[in-house]
Amino acid sequence: MKTITTDCLVIGAGLAGSAYALQAARQGLQVELLSLEGPLVANSDWAQGGIIYDRSPAPEQLAHDIVEASDGTANPAAVEHLVREGPAAVQELLLDELDVAFDRDARGELELAREGGHSSRRIIHAKDLTGHAILQSVAARVDGTPAITRRSGWVAVDLLTLSHNSDDVADRYAPLTCFGAYVLDTATGEVHAVVAKKTVLASGGLGQIFLHSTNQPGSVGHGMAMSYRVGARLIDLEYVQFHPTVFFKKNAPRFLITEALRGEGAVLVNSRGERFMDAIHPRGSLAPRDIVARAIHLELAASGEPCVFLNLSAMKPDFIRERFPTVAARCAEHGVDVTREWIPVVPAAHFSCGGVHTDLAGRTNVRHLNAIGETACTGLHGANRLASTSLLECLTSAKFTALADGADIKAGGFRLPQPRLWQAAAREADPTLIRQDLQLLRSTMWNYAGIMRSPKRLTRARRILLELREEIQSFYRDCRVTRELIELRNAVQTALLVVHAASLNPVSKGCHYVVDGE
């Protein structure tokens, strides 16, 4: 086992992890940045709509929209922090330093879009590939920064804590403290130890524990599961947001249909052309996501139809092709001309409003363990997230966590012990069993812990998942670790955490909707 020592270990190289790495490097810190895949394989890369850049004289209106979308449950301190600090975070990194190619009008001013739940236009964008444009620029800057070492194909296995993984016997009595992680190099199959003064979880969300998801493969709540195993507090995990509009066609892949379409005039209709959202919410098709997703679910249950539709007829064809080229091209690949035809859509798991509980500087209850981005939960989103807040949250949480970590490290007082050697098993896990277990897990979560839940459904889900966890733990104890086995182990733990949180909360709020009966 090789041991690598650094100032900061960042697990996840999406926007939050990469922005943290850049901010930490500017303070003279050495950073190890781990990612499952290459630099652009992250949920941030798939964000289509945009990022909030609110320079209005009335920022309190944005705060109002965030709280309203959350059904009145958002943490006021977290909301105020994002509204106050968000514009500077965007200006400093994305506009001044990286000059990201956001869309501009004929005068050179940033174009502003509107999405569901927003009372005004305040979202900047790069066509319908905003996340890709941002992450591409950020990743290039990361790769040009000597203080940052990118480790693609390195997967965190478990966090290191003094009481469990130090080779110093006296550390078993130490306060709960993280000092890095065991990490699998998937290219060699070897497990190494990365020892760090600060460990930052930026591993994204958990959407792939559900059968239908907008998330990248591997988004199974890695950071949430690992932090739970070392005693970190998790909160609000019952609040899983389902995006209302994901492309649906038999034998075609599911992909996100950006909410910005509805901001520009697209409306949801059923197979008869009826605008069913108009009778449900004053904003109609621009209602908050939880309301729209649930309305679609109920519409489909009542009609027996497989999908609803987005009607884009309010937009001119040239505007659609110019503003939404990615959506137009991907739909065309599957036989839908969005300038003339309705887009068939269904909801899918999209974003975890809950996560590892942190303060506004990313600190968890485990010393020297931080969490940022979607992995973390400050209470910003409460029971439901407002559209286009996710990328902004990534930037602000990364910035302030890195600044706090820089100050802590400069103050000194860190002791990094030698970790215990990793004990590798020899037997290979059966890949067929792993695939089947993951499929069962995802189907269970979709059917029993999805958009609408009941106590009996959740009880059934918990029973199935507990049996699965026993089998998976046996794999993990007896077999050599692989990426697939790590993902399965973390997926079942995260799924159980979501089901447990949902079972404890009988109150329907936002994304968590409880019904009586089977």
Briefly describe each language-model feature range.
Residues 198-255, 302, 388-400:
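Glycine-rich loop(s) and the adjacent beta-strand/alpha-helix scaffold that form part
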